[in-house]
Amino acid sequence: MRKLLSVIYYEYVMQLKRIATWGVLAASVVITLLDGFPSEKNLARIEFLLQPSYFIYRSLSFGALIATFGLMFLLSNRMAIDHKTGMKQLIMASPITKLQYIFGKLLGGFIYTYTVFSLFLALNTLVFYVSVPIDIALTDCLVPFSKALIINVLPVSIFISFISVALPAIVDVRLFYVLASVLFILNAASPDSADKMPFYLITSGDLKKLIWQHPKFPYINTDGIQANLLFLIGCGLISAVPLFLRRKLWRND
Amino acid sequence: MYNIELRNISKCYKNGVVALDNISFNVKNGVFGLLGHNGAGKTTLLKALVTVLKPDSGSIKVCGYDLKSQGDEVRKRIGYLPQELSMYPSLSVFDFVNYMAQIKGVYDKNQVNIALQQVEMLEFSKRKIGQLSGGMKRRVGIAQALVGNPEILVLDEPTSGLDPEERVRFRGILSRFAKDDKTIILSTHIIEDVYQVCEELAVLRKGRLFYAGASADLINHVEGKIKVIKIDNENQLFDIQKQAVVISTTYASKGLTVRIVDKNMNFPGAESVSATLEDAYVYCMGGKNDA
Amino acid sequence: MKQIKSELMILGINPILILAFLVVVFTLIAIFAGEMLNLSLIGFEVIFPFIAAIFIGEWGKIKADDNYDMIAAQGKSLISWVLYRSVTVFATVTFFVVLCMAIVFHIRSEIPLQEMILIYLSPAFMLSTLTVLCNLIFTHEHVSTLVCGMIWLLAMLSKSMLRYPMTEYIYLFIRYSGDRNGIWLINKSVIIAICAVIWTGICLVYGKKNR
């Protein structure tokens, strides 16, 4: 167990130490605030911007997609790099099991994604709370923020971290980029709507509607939420399976 | 009792290359050298020894444990430095060695400091791996192998690319480690390293074991046969090559000095010199199976 | 010609297989996707230009190439190497894209073929140019693709910026966003002109020095 925790910890630390991590975080926060900062002009342009839950809801459709796209790239060579640098041989020669190594990589990536994504939301919410021109109770911000951490950030982090760590270890990382770009463009091209949303939306699917709903459309698409959740968690978990099955990945015990 | 016992190890890669062909030898305490050309099978043999690669046939016992059935016990006792190791550039020296220590199940940070002290890297422990020189990186690589005080150290060409000062420092580290009844397997191209620290060695040639035994015995194979001849031109050199194995040729302003193994005593008048390990090795590699 | 042949050999078979795979996928989408989707616009103005940039970033590596120091130290001209490499990758991708366009046109006839080529070229050229610029700056693998990907995604997400005056002249995906004022040809020309300026800068800076 301690070996697994060590792999997770160092995987997490190594990723957080990358300048690119903070670049992606900064870029996505700036982009979100450019769109939804509660300035006079934006408040006039965006109807519900005074509501903290709407601000978080909106952040999830815009900057969050940029953040997840960046994190996906940063996670995509975590296993390939061990092969390239000779670290895999070294690790395989140590008394550590395949399960410990793979789970360590996957969970380290997951905790990293969850941290960065949470920081992204926290920073945006903090800026919103400080800058909004009316008095808002802190709990009004904390409640939707906490909801987002559980309802949205958790499944999205599983999806992004697991597919980004696992798939490039199985297929050419560049094919993975091409496939991911198609998925992200489908996400970016999908307009926001009160109707049932496509299941494949990463940060702006029906799950997001549990945080804020348009007052004119106060119903919940339960099957849409389930499909969205199933897609995110299911794809994440399924993409990890080939790693465990692939014999070439590890020494023959 | 031997610390490592290899019996009839063979490995053939999918492309048909026979990397190891029926290799058998034993290794006892001390520093054991593994010599051979590029592609002779040294790295394959070491990978098999550290359980990273499975041989097609044969058996290996390390510290009495069978590699096939007791791989975990073997891994607990081995420190390994692969031929090519870039490590994680974003981690500090301490963090990297600590990471490897924890993977090995060693959670005492003092052990990390001791390993860094052994390779004289303690003062650089906070420096990032990416900011180290090539020699320092190698020392960190050795530190991660030393951490946890393994019984057996497997080093794959650890001195390649190091300057002479670093190599001397490295030999000192090995000698200190070997003092405590430990076993070190050192694969290298550099005969000088083997000569300085190894009591025993094995020579691989094209996947086959060419020699295994004491360094002194290998030298004895050519003792009394090493001669130095001074000649005037290269035509004479070609004649010599037909009758003896040429170890080295030195060009001077007036002619050439040729160092040879005069196995059949074709040059009785030539000056005899004492044999070195390099003479014996080059003779083995250059030539005849009956050496 | 010899250098292009060498670059093609360095490129290898993997990118060709991936491109062929994409053509097959697009063909299937063209056959089975409903009429609500304008595949020609989203495919050739948005998706394939970024795929071209991914290929330039991943297979047209410059500073991230393991042999960069050797080539920079010994090559006659760094800029010609950069040009040969980037153009080879771009041309290879474009060949498959045009093939895909022909198939999509044959199946769906949404937009004339020559219009599709025009729609594709300017965003592809812009994103590829930015990737080459990143390739010349960053020594780490995948960073160029990451930077360009974020720009691409941001451009896609910032359609609302078109409300500001003049932005429609430089917006990358003008046809996909609706082209309310019918200025797409001007937009494409402006973007290509910006690319030409960037390339002139690259040639001036890297043409003089070898590293």
Q: What feature does the model see in each segment?
A:
Chain C
Residues 40-63:
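Long, hydrophobic alpha-helical segments
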Residues 144-211:
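Terminal transmembrane helical anchor/hairpin motif
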Residues 83-109:
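Hydrophobic alpha-helical transmembrane segments that constitute the membrane-spanning cores
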